[in-house]
Amino acid sequence: VRDGVIKDETFLPLIFSAPPDADWKDEAVWARANPNLGVSVNLEFLRSECARAVEMPAYESAFRQLYLNQWVEVETRWLRMDHWAQGNGACPVDLAGRECWAGLDLATTFDTTALVLLFPLDDGTFWVEPHFWIPSDNAHQRERRDKVPYLTWHRQGHLHMTDGNVTDFDQLRRDINNICTKYRVRGIGLDPWNAAQLGQQLQGDGLPMQHFRQGYASMSAPSKQLENWVVSGKLLHGGHPVLGWQAANVAIQSDSAAGNIKPSKAKSTERIDGIVSLVMAIGLWQTATAPTPEQTWDLTVI
């Protein structure tokens, strides 16, 4: 009606929205998009929703779309580094023989391969042990391209290197088996796309491999859980530099209507494979520890 596509003189379209460049945290801006603010639109509710968007950047797009009628990109920078830094301390317990879940994200041509293990601790926090691999022959090239110190990280023990200029999957397989012998690994999530052979080999080695596709259905709930743990300080990672770099890189994409989110490799500025692996590990933990519905019995009278 507004654009003249449909002619209906009984219909008056009025669209109230905040200007695209307006400060979405300014209450005066809220009034421009909500002319009935304080009457049918509750001001305290909007304040609480705005505070949520400030604390959790992934919610900013939804707040601006739903309450300010702004057109925004569906992806947004995700994790705040001051929140992430709450997990920088050393691991408080001995992890040997401890129960954990893991996610494995295999590298494409330029990515890192990442295995991330998630350990639930007795105090309700979660320790993360990440492992990363790149090929040794192009490490200098990767440093120049990504502008991060891969060689230094390797010398410090934060990054594995495989021989050659592509990932050596035989070495990767040996490394993963050696890592997993130290713990009680309950599941390793792996997207079956382009990884079927290694997944079958690792399963043949006795590792508990599980298919974990990287769509909204699988990734949204654990992504939200990760965000919650980061904000609340429950995610402990020891300040691992590679994982921290990738946490700073990650952006999410969202189907705003349903409220689903997931990390987006396409929208992120640099590598995020460790975060994707961590989300998969959280997803397996959620599935394994979800309460089983109590069985109920119905009485049938004949």
Question: Language-model segments: what does each one mean?
Answer:
Residues 182-193, 198-199:
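Short glycine-rich phosphate-binding loop at a beta-alpha junction
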Residues 2-34, 145-157, 201, 205-292:
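Metal-dependent DNA phosphodiester-chemistry modules and their immediately adjacent helices/loops
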Residues 1-101, 110-112, 127-170:
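Non-catalytic, compositionally simple segments
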